[in-house]
Amino acid sequence: ILDEESTLHNCDNPEDKVNDGSIQFDNVSFSYIDDKEKECLKNINLNIPSGSTLGIIGGTGSGKSSLVQLIPRLYDVTEGSVKIGGVDVRDIDIYTLRNEVAMVLQKNVLFSGTIKENLRWGNKEATDEEIIHACELAQADPFVQTFPKKYNTYIEQGGTNVSGGQKQRLCIARALLKKPKILILDDSTSAVDTKTDALIRKAFKDEIPDTTKIIIAQRISSVQ
């Protein structure tokens, strides 16, 4: 594995900025292997205006995660194109692209260190005020305030000393600190109760209206 080279490369003279958070899928097909008979996505056409919210619900293995992983170019499409801000993602500098797209997965990772240190992986220049605000939006601040050391509380490797729902909310806050143009939540509130889930969605609507939000969920209430 260490000797393998990535198949994802910048084109010559890539774009160094993302114009906005609009997303367009043009006749997209995708397969993890070079076999058209085993495509997990086929002929997908999708237009997501900048600042809008899209909810995606589907069974396990239906291609939900594969779809959104094409947006930050974790994989390249087999056919068709994915555009952000009107530009094909293959024509945007990979670092620039991924800096403008934040993804929060169902099983995200916390590292050993304080809560502040973990959150600054999203933005190493984030101020204490920005950290608290991001946690307020993600509904993490209420439980952080109950810890004796609050934001200086030490998190064990893998976040083993916080609950699954607390871990997910901290990971959402970390993504918000990037101030991305596109925010993707891939079943990342699955361990959060429905009331808190609703508060997170309301905060997104009120506080980050210009951010394009894609929410993948198992619960219908999570995308309403």
Language-model regions, residue ranges each:
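ABC-type nucleotide-binding domain
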Residues: 3, 7, 11, 16-224
